[in-house]
């Protein structure tokens, strides 16, 4: 009877054997993400994680979920699937870092119409690499084969991250005040936002993936699939020595929509546009898309993937720590008093 049901399910478009083959493929590198606290192996009904609270007086769990968006389309176009998993981890982990949380574990959801074991293995390998960079465990996941739901050969991803922070050390921006300094940390490139506009511009220009980006040594293929940078090591090290008042992950909505999310109503962030190095891909997108820089900063990170807001007297120490970690960082602005009618982000060109 079980063989009949299995064949019927296969005829309906769901291959259980392919799912089992995937589990076999990924077990070794998923296990490499294990950290202290992991109690379960891959393949169970749930992932088990034991919290170590010896250094946390009032533990607060912080969670986030996200995807990779239409950046996946370039993975399909270029048939390269081993880096978008890093993007998936980065989008979730970077969000919980904003509140001072240390990532603990990650879960993924992979959905496709017909499971391609090799392709899915590459994706989950990337997720494992992202988890290792973030120093969190890949505790489990779901692979959903959904016949007819997706274009053949394509898939979608979702990620879920949980971290921990002591309640007394939550970073929420409430202490930000006039005179504080804004530091920008370099992005690795476009990261994972704005790709619908990127695709539109790319298609209009009919460029080839192996063309060199003007002003760069990199090809479009290399830059378009360069993984989102994971900031956990940097932030977890900085927090030990620096009083950080607020942090911002520059994602969809760019500077204008993300920075206000951590600012008190009485202040504005004055950003000096000329204060950091803008990677060549953004100049190319701005020119070919006939976009103003205001529009660019509303959509893209334009070279700044993460923002720190710190007291003025901590700036030298913070910049020295960042330099010792070989992190590209710039003082990009300051916190000022909000006047009537002011937007909360002012870009000074």
UniProtKB/Swiss-Prot annotation:
GO terms for molecular function: ATP binding; phosphoribosylamine-glycine ligase activity; phosphoribosylformylglycinamidine cyclo-ligase activity. It holds the Pfam family AIRS. Its main location: cytoplasm. Keywords: ATP-binding, Cytoplasm, Ligase, Nucleotide-binding, Purine biosynthesis. GO terms for cellular component: cytosol. Transmembrane segments: none annotated. PANTHER family: TRIFUNCTIONAL PURINE BIOSYNTHETIC PROTEIN ADENOSINE-3, TRIFUNCTIONAL PURINE BIOSYNTHETIC PROTEIN ADENOSINE-3-RELATED. This is Phosphoribosylformylglycinamidine cyclo-ligase. It comes from Lawsonia intracellularis (strain PHE/MN1-00). The lineage of its organism: Bacteria, Pseudomonadati, Thermodesulfobacteriota, Desulfovibrionia, Desulfovibrionales. The gene is purM.
């Amino acid at each position: 009877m079980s063989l009949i049901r299995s064949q019927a399910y296969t005829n309906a478009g769901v291959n259980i054997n392919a799912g089992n083959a995937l589990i076999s493929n990924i077990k070794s590198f998923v296990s490499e993400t294990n950290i202290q606290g992991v109690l379960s192996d891959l393949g169970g009904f749930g992932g088990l994680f034991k919290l170590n609270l010896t250094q946390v007086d009032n533990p607060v769990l912080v969670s986030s979920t996200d995807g990779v968006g239409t950046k996946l389309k370039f993975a399909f176009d270029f048939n390269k699937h081993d880096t978008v998993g890093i993007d998936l981890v980065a989008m979730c982990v970077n969000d919980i870092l904003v509140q001072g949380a240390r990532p603990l574990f990650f879960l993924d959801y992979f959905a496709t119409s017909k499971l391609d074991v090799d392709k899915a293995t590459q994706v989950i390998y990337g997720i494992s690499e992202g988890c290792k960079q973030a120093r969190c465990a890949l505790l489990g996941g779901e692979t959903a084969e959904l016949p007819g739901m997706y274009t053949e050969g394509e898939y979608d991803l979702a990620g879920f991250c949980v971290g921990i922070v002591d309640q007394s050390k939550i970073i929420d921006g409430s202490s930000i005040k006039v005179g504080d300094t804004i530091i920008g940390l370099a992005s690795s490139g476009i990261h994972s936002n704005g790709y619908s506009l990127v695709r539109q511009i790319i298609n209009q220009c009919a460029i080839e993936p192996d063309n060199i980006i003007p002003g760069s040594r990199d090809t479009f293929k290399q830059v378009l699939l360069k993984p989102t940078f994971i900031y956990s090591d940097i932030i977890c090290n900085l927090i030990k020595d620096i009083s950080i008042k607020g942090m911002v992950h520059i994602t969809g909505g760019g500077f204008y929509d993300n920075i206000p999310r951590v600012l008190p109503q009485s202040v504005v962030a004055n950003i000096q546009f000329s204060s950091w190095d803008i990677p060549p891909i953004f100049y190319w997108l701005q020119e070919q898309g006939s976009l103003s820089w205001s529009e660019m900063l509303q959509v893209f990170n334009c070279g700044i993937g993460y923002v720190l807001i710190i007291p003025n007297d901590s700036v030298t120490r913070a910049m020295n720590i960042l330099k010792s970690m070989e992190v590209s960082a710039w003082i990009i602005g300051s916190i000022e008093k909000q006047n009537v009618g002011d937007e909360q982000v002012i870009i000074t060109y």
